[in-house]
Swiss-Prot record:
The gene is pdxA. Substrate binds at residues 133, 269, 278, 287. It is an enzyme of class 1 (oxidoreductase). This is 4-hydroxythreonine-4-phosphate dehydrogenase. GO terms for cellular component: cytoplasm. It comes from Xylella fastidiosa (strain 9a5c). It holds the Pfam family PdxA. A divalent metal cation binds at residues 161, 206, 261. Its EC number is 1.1.1.262.
Amino acid sequence: MLHPALALVPGEPAGVGPELCVRLVQQPRQDCRLVAFADPATLQAAAAALDLPLRLLPPEALAERPGDLPIQAQCHVHPTRFGHPDPANAPAVIAALCEAASDCVHGALHGIVTGPVHKAVINQSGIHYTGTTELLAAQAECDVVMMLANPHLRVALVTTHLPLRDVPDVITAALLERCLRIVNTAMCGDFGIATPRIAVLGLNPHAGEGGYLGREELDVVIPVLQRLRAEGMVLLGPLSADTAFLPTKLIGYDAVVAMYHDQGLPVLKHSGFEQAVNITLGLPYPRVAVDHGTALDLAGRGVADPSSLFAATALCARLAVSRALLSVRS
């Protein structure tokens, strides 16, 4: 399979997702076939705002010219007003994600590319929602890891959206081991690295300084690393986060595992925010998302940067091909 079929889910309809999707399909793709799971009227309105062509096709059709986009319609209750989210449309946003995921699980599609979703708006609708990563993991009934990547760096997270005061209690040996196994498997299978070198950051300053600045490294991190190294995994650390991202050290890693959100992601975003993407490791299909928010203040103005969506789509296509080739070999 060298031309995978990918679901394209714009996310929050009042944000920049729809117009970024319109920009994405202005050039026919050679690496994948895209099927949008979205509200047709919203996409048409985005195309009109950008003064770009858009021809919506049946979901099984092939895109043949600029602006062609097969679509599995997810109609909204109320018309979209760019910049003004409507909680009444939140069920359609969730339905688009769930239907796309179901099609991937059943083999009709080979991966999902997602735009930014507005968590607060979905929760205001009465739907409990913590994030797309968690939603897809629950639907697939599997453990997942969030990884953000750009052309220079890959950073996976042991914990994601938690208050900082809660992080030490959440990081258990079982959680850390599960995270490292998922990252190692993904680096081997999805990214084709036979023996990935994974840098693991410590939780505390200076990785605990031998216990003087916290015992989590001694009590949790080091025993897990020793156990997994005995199985053959190449794990570096625990490393002090303040020097782990020096360029001379990064050349020795294939991925970095950070203990919490703001330990690793500021460095990644500083090194290449426009090309950064969010990858969900551990799902039975590739899912790659943009690494930015809904940008309600930019929606409908035609000024939003599509670079992250372009990068997410290209990477998702490559990962889908890697999975197919791995399946053939096994």
